[in-house]
C-alpha cells in the first residue's frame, strides 16, 4: 500500500499541535487546587481562555510529556485509519473514460495560419510548421486507413498537397495527380519531378547508384532489390538468393570503383605524409570531384550488372572468362583485401553445377533489365534528391495499381530517399533538413518492402521529415510488416491516425479497440403478472465500447475518425476539398486548361556542359580499370 508523504507530514504537524495542547492542559490541571471534580470543572470552564492568554510554555514535566505523546500518537492513528480504509472512487468512469474530443480540444493543434497545417478532417488540423508547447507538440507522421472510394486521395492527399507548406513526395497509383496538380506547383516555384513506372518513356530517370557513398549503402540497395524480386521458389530456399547476392555484390562494387576508382597503395602512402589541414582540404576536393562526376552521369547502372553477368561465360578454347580477367586486373592494381575482391572470392567458392545454377539464378534475377524502357529509366538519374530538403520540390511516383512487376523500383526509390536525406540532414545540416519533406505513401502495400521501415518512421521525425502510410485496411500493414510485429511499431510512431471508413471487419474491430471503453448507466426493470404481481427497478453501471465494431462499420459516408496521441478521439466530417482556396487552380480532366501534359525523357535531357566531348566507356570491351 502506498502512503502519501505530504499527508503524513500534515498529520505529524497536527499531532504535534494536539500533543502540545494536551501538555498545556496537563500543566493547568496540576496547577489547580481542590479535589478532582473541581479541577476538571475549572479546566473545562476556564482552561481554553487560560491557554490562549499564555499559549507558550515549554516547561515539560513527566506527566505533561506523557500526554504530549498521547496527543501525537492519537493523530497518527487517525492518519493510519484514513489511509488504510481509503476507497478510490471515480464516479462515472468506473469501467472506462473514453469519450469523443471537443471542438476546444481540436483547436489546441491548430497553427497560426491555415496554410501551416496538415488537414486531417473538416475541423481537425495538426500544425506542420509552428512550434507548439510540449503538451500539444506531436510528431508529423500520420497513418491513414480507408477502403476503396473512401476519399484517401480526394479528401486527404490532394488538399494537403496544395497547402504547399513543404516538399512533397507522393505515390500516385491511378489519379493522374501530376497532370491535375503539376501546373500549380510549377507556378509557385517548385521543382517538379515525375518518376513514372507506368509510362517509363515519359519519366525522370532514377539511378540509385548516384547516391551510393559507402559499402553499407551498396549492400542495402542490393538487399532491397533482392527482397522485392523474390519468386515463389526462392522464398522456399534462400540459398540461391544468398549465392546470387554474393556475385552481384562483387559486380556492383566493381562498377562503383570503375566509375570512381579507389586509391592505390601509393596514393594512400602519399596521403599519410600530409598534415591534418592538407588532408582535410584534399578530402573536400575529392568529395567535390566525385559529386561533379555524378552530375555528369558518371555512375553505374543495374543494366551494366546485367551485361557483366553475361561475360561470365567462356568461349571455345578460352581458359578464362572476360569477367575473370577484369577481376584479375583489378586485384593487381588494388589488391585483394577490399570489399570487391572479398565478395568475388566468396563467389568463386561455388563450383561446377552449383556455379552454373548461381549464374542462371542471377541472370534471371536481372532479366528485367533487358527491357529497353527499364534500362533507359535507370541509366541516368535526374531526380536530384539532395535538393529536396533545400528547395521546395514536388515529386510524383506513378505506379501501376494492378501490376507488381516493377515494385522493386518503388521500393528502391524510397529506400534511397530515406537513406540520402537522413545522411544529408546529419552531415550537411547538423541534424535537420532546412525544409520539411513529407512522404505520402498511397497504396502502401503496393510499394514493396522497405528495409527497417518501422525504424525509419521513428528516425526521420527528428530530421524534419514525416511519413504518411495510406492503407485500405489494417491487414495490409500486418501482412507486409508482420515480422516482430513491426506493424505495431509503425502505427505507434504515427502520432495521428485518420480512419475514413471502409468495409473490412478486422479494421472495424481494430478501430473499436483503439477508441477504448466508456462507462454507461443501465436500468433493469422486471414485472411479474399473476394473483400477487410484483415489479422491480434497478440501476447499475457497465462498460461499453465508445464505438462497437458494427458502429464503426456503419459510420456515415461523410464521417471520419481522427486519433491524435494522448487525446480523446475526434469524430468529424471528412474535409470538403472543393472549398480549399487553391482547389480552383487544379485540373479535373484532360480537356481542362490547367491539365499538365508533361513530356520528360532523361536520356534527352541536356546535362552540364562538361559532358560535351566526354568519351563514354563501354565496360564490355574493357578489361581493366583505367
Segments (PLM) and residue ranges:
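Compositionally biased amphipathic helical and low-complexity segments enriched in hydrophobic
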Residues: 3, 10, 45, 121, ...
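Residue-identity detector for glycine
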Residues: 5, 15, 19, 34, ...
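Short alpha-helical interface patches
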Residues: 49, 54-55, 65-116, 215-225, ...
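P-loop NTPase motor domains
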Residues: 22, 27, 133, 138-465, ...
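Conserved ATP-driven motor cores of ASCE-family P-loop NTPases powering translocation/secretion/packaging/pilus
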Residues: 457-561
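Basic- and hydrophobic-enriched, low-structure N-terminal and domain-boundary segments
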Residues: 1-150, 154-157, 201, 517, ...
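Low-complexity, intrinsically disordered or weakly predicted helical/coil tracts enriched
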Residues: 6, 186-187, 208-211, 525, ...
